[in-house]
Amino acid sequence: MTSILNTVSTIHSSRVTSVDRVGVLSLRNSDSVEFTRRRSGFSTLIYESPGRRFVVRAAETDTDKVKSQTPDKAPAGGSSINQLLGIKGASQETNKWKIRLQLTKPVTWPPLVWGVVCGAAASGNFHWTPEDVAKSILCMMMSGPCLTGYTQTINDWYDRDIDAINEPYRPIPSGAISEPEVITQVWVLLLGGLGIAGILDVWAGHTTPTVFYLALGGSLLSYIYSAPPLKLKQNGWVGNFALGASYISLPWWAGQALFGTLTPDVVVLTLLYSIAGLGIAIVNDFKSVEGDRALGLQSLPVAFGTETAKWICVGAIDITQLSVAGYLLASGKPYYALALVALIIPQIVFQFKYFLKDPVKYDVKYQASAQPFLVLGIFVTALASQH
C-alpha cells in the first residue's frame, strides 16, 4: 500500500476475464475499481459493474513491521571452515570461488575416495609403486572433487526450492551465485570427471572402457536422483539406496576395475553394503523434514515420522553390516568377520548416545563419531574379498 501515492486511483478494463481463487479481481468491459487511501490509515477498495458494487475497507499495515519467519541470513557465528566444507553452520561468503567450492561439499568427498582405496585393495593387484599411486590418486580426483562435486552441485540446484524454505541463506536460493554460473560448474565437473575416467581406461590398458562406463552410469544416476521427471529422491527407499550405491559401490567398482577385474561376488557384496549407505543417507533427511513435507517429497522421516524413521535408519546400517560379517564367516574368513563385528559395536553405542536421542540435533556429531568405524569395516571387507 505504501507504493500508492495518490489519494484516489481508478482502473478501467478493456476485455472480459474472471475472478481468480486467490483474491485478485480481473475486470471486464465497463467495470471499474476505485482504490482510496485515507490519512486515518484506512483504505477502501470499490469494485463496480452493472448491477453490482463490491466494497472492501481495511486498516493499512506498515510492511516494515511484517517480517519473514525464516531468516534470510546465515545464523550469527557461522564458521568459514564449515562454509568451505559445505556443511550447515557456514558463514555467508561473497567470494565466488569459495562459493563454488561450497557447492561441491568437500565434506562428502572422503567416502568416495575411501571407496577407491577399498576397490584397489580388493583387486589384489595394487602395488606401492609411483605408477599405481598416481593412478589411484587420479581415480580419487575423478570420484571425489569432480563427480561428487557434480552430484552435489546439481542436487543443490534442483533443491533450491526446498533450501528456500529450510536454509534460504544458502548460495543458490540467496542469489550469491547465478544460474549460468551454477550450470557452467555442473558441466565443467561432469566433463572433467568423464575425461579423467577415459584417461584411466587408456592408462590401465582396458579394451573395454570400464571406468568410463562406471563414471557415466554414476553421473546418470546422480542426475535422475535430483532432477525431474524421475527425481528418485522423492521416494525415500529408492532415492536413499541410489545414494548409498553411489557412495559405496561405484567408487569401489572403479578402484577394482582400474587395478583388476570386477567379479559377481564383489558386485553383490557391495550392493548389499549399499543398504548401509541407505541408512547413512536417511541421517541427512531429518534436518529437511519441513521443506520435504512442504514440497511433497516422501523422505522416510516424512513418510513414517521421525521416531520410526530413526529406527529404520540404524536398522539398515547395523543389520547390513552383521549380514556381511555372517557372509564372511560362512566364506571361511572368521577373523575378518570378527574384526567387522568389533567395528559394529562402537557404532551401536554412538547410535544410542547421540542419534536415537535426537537425530536432528546430533546428526553431525553422530556421523563424526560412528562413520569412521563404518568405513573401516568396508575396508576390512575389501581385504577379505581380495582377488
Swiss-Prot record:
Sequence intervals crossing the membrane: 182-202, 210-230, 241-261, 266-286, 311-331, 336-356, 364-384
A GO cellular component entry from the record: cytosol
Known pathway: Porphyrin-containing compound metabolism; chlorophyll biosynthesis
Record's protein name: Chlorophyll synthase, chloroplastic
EC number of the protein: 2.5.1.62
Gene3D superfamilies: UbiA prenyltransferase (1.20.120.1780)
Region feature Disordered, mapped onto this chain: 62-81
Biological function: Involved in one of the last steps of the biosynthesis of chlorophyll a. Catalyzes the esterification of chlorophillide a or b with a preference for geranylgeranyldiphosphate (GGPP) rather than for phytyldiphosphate (PhyPP).
